[in-house]
From Swiss-Prot:
Name recorded for this polypeptide: General transcription and DNA repair factor IIH subunit ssl1
Region (Disordered): 1-35
Organism: Schizosaccharomyces pombe (strain 972 / ATCC 24843)
PROSITE patterns: VWFA
Residues modified to Phosphoserine: S15
Oligomeric and partner information: Component of the 7-subunit TFIIH core complex composed of XPB/ptr8, XPD/rad15, ssl1, tfb1, tfb2, tfb4 and tfb5, which is active in NER. The core complex associates with the 3-subunit CTD-kinase module TFIIK composed of mcs2/cyclin H, mcs6/cdk7 and pmh1/tfb3 to form the 10-subunit holoenzyme (holo-TFIIH) active in transcription.
GO annotation terms (biological process): nucleotide-excision repair; regulation of transcription by RNA polymerase II; transcription initiation at RNA polymerase II promoter
Localization (cell): Nucleus
Highest rank taxon of the organism: Eukaryota
Organism ancestry: Eukaryota, Fungi, Dikarya, Ascomycota, Taphrinomycotina
Keywords: DNA damage, DNA repair, Metal-binding, Nucleus, Phosphoprotein, Transcription, Transcription regulation, Zinc, Zinc-finger
Similarity field: Belongs to the GTF2H2 family.
Location of the VWFA domain: 88-267
Sequence ranges of Basic and acidic residues compositional bias: 1-21
Amino acid sequence: MNENQKSFDSDKSESEDEQKNGRVKVRSRKTDDNEGYTWEGEYQRSWDIVQEDAEGSLVGVIAGLIQSGKRKRLLRDTTPLQRGIIRHMVLVLDLSNSMEERDFHHKRFDLQIKYASEFVLEFFEQNPISQLSIIGVMDGIAHRITDLHGNPQSHIQKLKSLRDCSGNFSLQNALEMARASLSHIASHGTREVLIIFGSILSSDPGDIFKTIDALVHDSIRVRIVGLAAEVAICKEICNKTNSSTKNAYGVVISEQHFRELLLESTIPPATDSAKTTDASLVMMGFPSKVVEQLPSLCACHSIPSRGGFHCPRCKAKVCTLPIECPSCSLVLILSTHLARSYHHLFPLKNWSEIPWSANPKSTHCFACQLPFPKPPVSPFDESTSSMRYACPSCKNHFCLDCDVFAHEQLHECYGCQCSGN
């Protein structure tokens, strides 16, 4: 009897003994090298990471985890840099068969549509005078989903109408169509491409290195968010087209990381000083809103409406702002759009966290006037955070919610505005 037969008989006898004792041995289909998908780790023995605070309560621990996550998102580089606030971006979606994989809690395709919709809203919230176009790639062919314009609702409607995935992905075809869409952009606007790449291969019809050289010649920046693994050609594309931007290529490790990598592209890129030309004025129009008694066709969509905005140059009516006038090509915006884009040039400084050891005297938040937590009784907790955050300019103390609101929405300090700084 050989060794294989002996091992088989021993396994068989072991299983028979277990069945007699009323125990059934369940064998896992997963090996030690492959313990499961990444999202499953969030639900396996999650009670092991629960820890009580000094008073035996879980409320303080949960609040601390939430606050640490908020603070991590706020700690950004606030160095004032020259940035291109008039942006033109092409968002490329992967609609190949690889997006049917379920290595996240949801399918890659569903997660892509969800976070792409959030990206569109956040992009126009942070860059109101910019324009966006969407391209989808399936069966190795690039399809234009939306044209280059500044209406976020139109982009989201087209995204939600996508259903099918098929074939392979083609980096070269996607980049060539994106380059053709951005070729007519003036020099004062940025040219950017953001690719969601869920495959590990690219079915290209020609030499992609010639396409990379053309992108560098046309000053087009490419950022790629990978969903499967790091691909060498993607890294080379990002390195060659982003001379001043680091970490332009990232591979997601979780659903939250996927969202964070996408939203990083909402911040305008820094301008390369070596390629910067002399500053020039850009002509823009500030139209007046009109309300008509009888509906008339707009110049942008040819849809009858009673209200809109009249171009100050050619008097053509458009539905929404910002937009480029379809008749005279004048950029039509509101003054609030410029104000919302201005904060990227001079970002609000990060507020420092005040520990109990600093003996803070403030009892209420300067902005919302809610009371701060009381000092700890035991000296062991003096090294923990006091839930106070101080502005380096006005020295006032604020709570975490006001800190988040000031940096993500208002982009101004409450104390500095009150003191006139």
